Amino acid sequence: MPVRATKRGAARTPLHGEWDVVICGASFAGLTVARELARTDARVLIIDRYEIGERQTSACAAPTTWLEYMGLMDSVQQTFGELVVHTPGRTQRWSLPFTFSTFDYRRICALLREQSEGSAVFETATIKGPPARTGFTVHTDRGDVSAPLIVDALGWRRILGPGANVQPPDARLSRGLEIHPHARGDDLELWIDPKYVKRGYSWSFPADGELRVGVGSFDPRDHVKEPTVQLAEDVGVPAERWQGNWIPHQLRPATEDGIFFVGDSAGHCLPTTAEGIRPAFYFGLALGRELVDVVEGRQTREQALTRYGAFSHDHLWQYRWLLRVQNWVGRITPTRLLTPAIRAISPPGLVRWAFGSYRDICPPEYVLNRSRSGVLERQQTIGVSAGPDGQRAEVAGDGVHQQRPGDDQLQQASSQSM
């Protein structure tokens, strides 16, 4: 087995001290928070069990515009303007209203780290516990670190939350497993097929000489290794270079007991698609900007907790709709309704509307709008998406659809297919 780069032996010196901000977790969400704090004089400590970029758990794809606006294009490997969707006996090719790109995980983490250098110090350390913290002191295997502002970006376990956490298979989690064989492909592909998983989907994401092929189940009780082996055989690639993870599919409170939660620890991964990178960027920016206001004296910690918590909660209706779609897909996948249902939602105008609305949940323009704080930026951003008939529908200035386009259509389609 490969030896990880994590510090060992004499290199693991004691770690103690007080900081302005402690960020626990050094992947997409945590590094994005640190990126925003780089424009301040705050003393920021980032800690993670692994070195930055060391432990990939994602298929690593995101809307290209997000990568462009975040200054991360140097990590891009392949870009796709279409999505190929396979169901039993039929294949649909959807032309998307925006492109997705696969990227190199180690490189994108390095780029994010470069954007936070200057104020943030990174150290490898493992959070101990329970308890993982006492008040505003975090307990690690190298010592205790304290800060008035603490961020949990450690993933679905929500380690810094108060009380015991529900574990799989009882938690609201999906499970995913994938392989990374050395192979090439031209298409971003999905399989919605009970041959592989009854409640979920399978995928193949090409990434410049590597195929990321995997299976995800909405039901954490379902085993996904055998289906992944079967999919690899069908795609014609060896089942090698494995990775997997649990994936949250329900929004959770973004603040609790004085702690800020972002990314998977707050359930920010989008249901149905299990897209977690874009919301990690999005909510990481919002949280980072709130913390900037605290360290620069424009608001208190309590105000930041309230504002960031409200910002995350403002998206609850969108997460609930995606969870309904996820449940609907799970119900029809084992039935004969699956293929005709996917065919019914495949007209180009409907695809453009659906993906446009999906895009606007975490719009890339949010990166560029750097006004006083995350909540204000959300209020000032007007999201626009095309309806099924090609008409465009605005999102109100408070971040909530004045007329949520398509709710009636989605509800009608769901009821007809159930």
List PLM regions with ranges:
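Extreme N-terminal leader/targeting segments of oxidoreductases
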Residues: 1-19
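Glycine-rich Rossmann-fold phosphate-binding loop(s) that bind the pyrophosphate
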Residues: 25-27
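Glycine-rich FAD pyrophosphate-binding loop
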Residues: 38-57
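A short alpha-helix-loop-beta-strand transition element characteristic
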Residues: 53-54, 69-84, 169-171, 301-302, ...
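A conserved beta-strand/loop capping segment in the N-terminal third of enzymes
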Residues: 64-113
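Predominantly flavin-linked oxidoreductase catalytic cores and closely associated redox partners
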Residues: 115-240, 251
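FAD/FMN-dependent oxidoreductases across multiple families
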Residues: 129, 144, 219-296
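C-terminal helical "tail/cap" subdomain of flavin- and related membrane-associated enzymes
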Residues: 292-387, 407
